[in-house]
Amino acid sequence: GGVIDVVPSAVPADNRVFGDVTLLGKSVNGTIGGSLMLGIRKNAWYSHIRYSEQHFGDYRIPTDSIVYLTQRIPIYGRKLKNTAGIERNIGLFTQYQRRAYKANYAVSNVYQKTGFFPGAHGIPDASRVEDDGDSRNIELPFSKVNHLKVTTHQQYAWEKLILSGDLGFQNNHREEWSAFHTHYGSQPAPEKDPDKELAFNLNTFSASVKARFIGSSSWEHILGWDGQHQRNDISGYSFLLPEYRRSTTGMLWLTTYRPNNVFSVSGGVRYDYGYMNISSHEDTYLADYLRKQGYDPEQIDFYKWNSHSVNKHYGDYSLSLGLVWTPSDKHLVKVNIGRSFRLPGANELAANGVHHGTFRHEQGDANLK
């Protein structure tokens, strides 16, 4: 295990215009891509914009066949048909800093379209994986993802106090497309977008405030609050996750004591509260199918619900205490103890369907506490 800390690029010390170009290539799927960045530093202002794009073909694998649902599926040319894709990303960052005040603004958009291997999507059919002569086309089934993110960070520093705040908005739109298919003859194809199997539109609003108190050279405290609200809407002829509303908030206190360069103690406590409102989802076509098969009303009522309505409140605390001892340049000792709490996600409470992106069936448990 480990932790990766992604640190943003340092702001140039002097006024300048700068940029870079990066090219990318991979043999496993014929990836061709590149990234272009252009930036400027002018007195108190610093800005840069980056655009990246890559195209890739069907993935190569070291086998001539796979087994899916007990059926052997051939892999022609050792390439997974229809696993090609495209990615386009663009991001803009602007920062203003003057004396004790600093603010930055960021906007980014990430787009991806990738195909699904048809031999492992839906009912096994070897004819769907026959080589079509084009290793870079994207046909049904496929997925599309677009993620928009807008954030701002504001900060003001006094001699022994630093106040900061963040606001953010994210829109995550995901679609999975596959030729309309159903297990029940009574289910008609939708009039609009008949091949749209799944679609999720998740909007997230977030805010946070932190106050950092520097009492002395050896002691500092951080007091903070954050909150988030999410709304997820769905569409498509299949089902994986219901519509839901999720609101969370939390307060924290952290403290660090460093009497010298050899020893330090840090600790903190946090309390989180959350509310989850999940809509029920009824499969009327399954209910009709079971009714025609002669199931009794009690069995039909049990099986027809993809998800049940959930209205739950959650709240609990987390705490931690850590010691760091550095007796020499070659030795470091760390001791940590803590208790953690995490609010469950909507998928953990109410998912019920095949998630092709992770190649598994997911089923939530509404009784999680």
Question: Where are the model-predicted features located?
Answer:
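N-terminal periplasmic accessory domains that precede
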Residues: 1-23, 32-37
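Transmembrane beta-strands of outer-membrane beta-barrel proteins
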Residues: 17-21, 47-49, 101-105, 161-167, ...
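Transmembrane beta-strands of outer-membrane beta-barrel pores
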Residues: 23-29, 42-44, 53-57, 98-100, ...
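Transmembrane beta-barrel wall of Gram-negative outer-membrane proteins
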Residues: 29-55, 68-117, 146-158, 214-219, ...
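Solvent-exposed loop segments that connect transmembrane elements
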Residues: 63-78, 119-136, 179-195, 277-310, ...
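Flexible loop and strand-edge segments within Gram-negative outer membrane beta-barrel domains
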Residues: 81-87, 101-159, 163, 169-203, ...
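Structural signature of Gram-negative outer-membrane beta-barrels, strongest in the C-terminal barrel
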Residues: 218-222, 226-230, 236-369
